[in-house]
Amino acid sequence: NRHIKVWNLSLGTSIDSSLDDFSDFGMALDNIQDENNVLIIKSAGNCTNFTRQLPKSRIAQSADSVRSVVVGSLAHAKGPYDYAEVDAPSPFTRIGPGPGSIVKPDVVFYGGNAGMNAGKLEKTGIKSFSIDGTPAYNVGTSFSTPWVSRMAAELTHLVKEEFDPLLIRALLIHNAKYPANNSMSMTDKVTQMGFGAPSSVQEMLYNSEDEITLILRDTLEKGSFIEMFDFPFPESLVDKDGNFVGQIIVTLVTKSLLDDKQAGEYCQSNIDILFGTYETETDRDTSKKGIKNPKGLEEPQNILLESLYSARVKGAHPFTGFERECTLVKYGKKFHPVKKYAIDLSEMTTSNRQRYCLLYTSDAADEEDSV
């Protein structure tokens, strides 16, 4: 059934994923997706640690699949004995990070709530149906995952192009947000909710009158990069002093080179993205080795850095639900196949922002990497 491009996988193991090595199950799922050009939406797994007042278990083996969109669970409601508040991670949902510190789960959606009453498990379930087709209620990441699978399938149907799993993953993650009423630290948000809960498909495909979305798709050879000068920016987002304002969300999803013989270094390529200001354009000597672009940048500055923003402004934007704190995710030197940044230009501590450029750089152990 290779014509079926989106697959829901609401099953897994009860064994925690390693912090260092990727599981055979997870790597097999990656291989299936590469060989068949399909996308698997995979449950993060459940744990019962909350029934014994223990910390949550990490994602199950198989949920460490790099290519899959791994889904955790949020509480949709709160019963009298449930532990989680509405829009908080469900008590049973497994958490990240994945091996090599990659962000897993990728996203979350509603999968129910649970708690204990005098030693008895109490559940507030999601409506589903049983084998005989009758309505049923239950909890688990097995029930949050199909919601995201449906979104992925709908996107596939509505995007009138050849199926591209990278594009579907990017749309889901780019349009994911953290619940505005959640007060968890940024570290806990990423660990338990990945990049957040995806918006509706209509919101993913059709911007509001206050938004613009650019999608860039290309393949980079080892050691190469792509530069964009004078990045397009609406005049309405330039204030009376000539400074840029507004929110920027940047999502980078790559088809990393994978090598199942390299244990914790399973991801063999990395792409970084820099977005920022520069002083002037300069001429470059293309006769020199490695220089292909006759134009270069003088004093470029990456604005996707925590140090450029005020720590005093916190919380969600009142209209968009936008969370600046995404900027605080530090990817370090690890190879991350998915990276997301969210910034609010009004919170910058420096005022001279005249132009923006976009720069991709590739650091690969092999020949090329898709983005």
Which positions does each model-derived feature cover?
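Secreted peptidase-domain scaffold signal
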Residues: K189-E281
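An often Trp-containing, charged/polar helix-loop segment at the C-terminal end
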Residues: V159-M184
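Extended charged low-complexity segments that act as oligomerization/scaffolding linkers
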Residues: N1, T51, Y81-A88, K104-P105, ...
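Short glycine/serine- and small hydrophobic-enriched flexible loop segments
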Residues: F109, S149-L158, H174
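Substrate-binding/access-modulating region of protease and related hydrolase catalytic domains
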Residues: N1-S65, P135-V139, F143-T145
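Extracellular S/T/G-rich loop segment that most often corresponds to the catalytic His/Ser-adjacent loop
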Residues: R58-S149
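Extended low-complexity, serine/threonine- and proline-enriched intrinsically disordered segments
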Residues: Q247-G321
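Single conserved hydrophobic/aromatic residue that forms the stacking wall/gate
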Residues: Y360-D369
